[in-house]
Amino acid sequence: ENLLAVPVIMGIKTRSETFAGAEYTYTIEGFIPEANKGIQCATSHHLGQSFTKMFDIKYNDENMQISHCYYNSWGFTTRSIGVMIQTHSDDQGLVIPPKVAPIHIVIIPIYTKNKDRVCKFCLDLQKELSLKYVVKVDFTENRPGYKYNYWELRGVPLRIEIGEKEIDNKMYTIVRRDTGEKIKISD
């Protein structure tokens, strides 16, 4: 819920749905509001001591008494990623929540001349932002519109557009991937 920004429903499975051999099973169901459906994303099975007694697995407790271990089994599945994609993505591609995004910010240099000046500024900004975020500067020779689309498709949470005009005016455009909102900020 906190990492993938997906609504979840947590609970205990019914006896008939409990993992074979388990005393009880907890579940986390990812909820997809648009589809009004839940998909199992994670489970935790409390297996008690049945398996450890069967295989004679023991340990010394804090009083140095020999006891059988309690055992559990759990899993967080790749279905969780599917729920995140279905919940957040749109017609432009992925929308990845910042806490799990492999790249948090992409900087797009825009220039017709003074390429070196713009690129140096972008590198300096990347260095500063990289203290807290994972930042990429797109130095490909593609046009800005192509770059915008490329990174939107991949779900990078924030895009910063930097050109000569922005450097001169000390005003920069930040674009949020989740809402498409363009925010002007000053240096």
Predicted ranges, named:
Residues 1-187:
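NTP/phosphate- and nucleic-acid-binding module
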